Amino acid sequence: MGYYSLTEITAVQYAKDHGYFEEKANVICHEIGDGNLNYVFKLDDGEKSIIIKQALPYAKVVGESWPLSIKRATIESKALQIFAQYVPDYVPVVYSHDEELAITVIEDLSRLTITRKGLIDGEEYPLLSQHIGRFLAHVLFYTSDFGLQSEEKRILEGTFVNPDLCKITEDLVFTDPFGHYDTNDYEPDLQLVVDELWSDKTLKLKVAQYKYKFLTRKETLIHGDLHTGSIFSSPSETKVIDPEFATYGPFGFDIGQFIANLLLNALSREEEKRSVLFFHIEKTWSYFVETFTKLWIGEGVEAYTKEKQWLPIILQNIFTDAVGFAGCELIRRTIGLAHVADLDEIENKETRIQAKKQALSLGKELIKYESKSADIQLFRTLFQQTVSRGVKA
């Protein structure tokens, strides 16, 4: 039959045909996806529920003029299963994957809330940073040369060649926001600030270096799109979803993206409500370092993990990269193709424009920063300096 796009009706029939519901069951189906690339259906018969996710052969956010390979669905399914080997508590269960139709059937997480929405609504999620720090440490360690024999790592790396979605990252994170490209999207009130950013040759040179790291450093399996919209949370649970951008890349990439999205939320808040975001930023790094260090000492397979002086160098390199990648993410989420609700939903125009100017300024500071130590307080310090400079709308 070949590939076809599901509807709510055909999604129900697919689920029944594959044994998830009895043929006579009264299954309610809704398309609930709010992402840019896929259909997501929730199916519920009153006793159990599942999620059916289908990759489209184009970017939904743009349309059929932007074709994409549906093989990304297989990459996403494989990534979730790899993550589950190391941190099963932090990912949804994958029930099945249909490569021909680019369909993945997964656990329904509707008991939880998308973390971005929860943070916008003022939720604090006390375990978020602990869970994400440990998730990152386990996945990044165990899929790298430190946790895998080199032969195994090369084989695994070959299964995560993801050209279409890597090209999206290359363009939308590292290239387009830093020049005159049609994909960019921002208010006219930002034009002077954007022009200044685009003319900053020092900034562009640093961005070029971070892009080159993304292109060439195949260090570990990264989620590739770890923002707060790719995480479900509750006060007691955290689940990482949507790793369709998964590929082998730099250790610091996911860390930087996650931190950047916490910073974007902090920029949307009044000063007295920001402390929980910096708590999560700082605790994410401390839990990552603590867990990564234990794995390095106890389970490192690379011979030189026995050299005590090497780990601090590795952690410093990861931190330096995370800082720069966070800066790139701040800028692309402010003036690039895919914005975030944290800033866009600020109702007062003057406040919204000021927050976006501050995001651009902070992004530039992070990209240019020459990190000499893995001091996680850096994010708080640069944030406060940026805000106190009084970037005016």
UniProtKB/Swiss-Prot annotation:
Question: Coiled-coil intervals in this record?
Answer: none
Q: What is one GO biological process annotated to this record?
A: L-methionine salvage from methylthioadenosine
InterPro entries found in the cross-reference section: Aminoglycoside_PTrfase (IPR002575), Kinase-like_dom_sf (IPR011009), Methylthioribose_kinase (IPR009212)
Keyword Cytoplasm among UniProt keywords: no
Q: Please tell me where substrate binds in this chain.
A: D225, R332
User: EC number(s)?
Assistant: 2.7.1.100
Q: Which reaction does it catalyse?
A: 5-(methylsulfanyl)-D-ribose + ATP = 5-(methylsulfanyl)-alpha-D-ribose 1-phosphate + ADP + H(+)
- Enzyme category, top tier: transferase
**What keywords would UniProt list here?**
Amino-acid biosynthesis, ATP-binding, Kinase, Methionine biosynthesis, Nucleotide-binding, Transferase
Molecular-function GO term, any one: S-methyl-5-thioribose kinase activity
Domain of life from the UniProt record: Bacteria
Residue sites binding ATP per the record: N38, K53, E107, D108, L109, D242, P243, E244
Oligomeric form and interacting partners: Homodimer.
NCBIfam families in the record = MTRK
What protein is this chain from?
Answer: Methylthioribose kinase
Gene transcribed to yield this protein: mtnK
